[in-house]
Amino acid sequence: MKKLMLISLALVSMFTSANAQLLYKISGKDLKSPSYIVGTYHLAPVSFVNAIEGIPDALNNTEQVCGELDMEDMKKPESVQKMAVAMLLPHGKTLKSMLTEEEYTRLNKLLKDLTSADMSNPIVEAKFGNITPQALNTQLTLLMSLKHARGFDPTQSFDDYFQKFAKRNHEPVIGLETVDKQIEVLFKSIPLERQKQLLMCLVD
């Protein structure tokens, strides 16, 4: 069966040139039909898909799409609720209690730059003050992309684009991972102290 598989890449540099090879065709004498692998990046603007040579032919020649997740599963209320709970710090912990005074000041400086407000604002503190460093890292990355990445829209993604294409054409969509696995990898597999270090790397 012809398949389009989306592989997320952690390298922004892959998207600095339309000439970078992001689409691969897999074929061979023992395969009845080819499959395609596309390298994607969550923070790349969806408009970039038009710069990937061969994408229209690949989409028109596939019978199913396989992504990191089935995006429809991710949008279900129960999945959103699970994610929100996983992003919270353990009871009694706050970001302020985890960071030194100097680190907290540096974090506030970045927040002020990105949102024109910091943790001294009750609304900002209520939104960010009790989430894990990893969750805040993700939120800050989105805010940075909104501010600096031309054409970035957090409501659209490569995965969503390809999966919607498949569903419009009545093709199956497969997720490589479950929502629970994503939560485990993103928010539970990294110790809090290491999350803090990664957060401060982003801040600095």
Where are these regions (language model features)?
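Structured, acidic catalytic/metal-binding patches in enzyme active sites
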Residues: K25-S35, Y41-D204
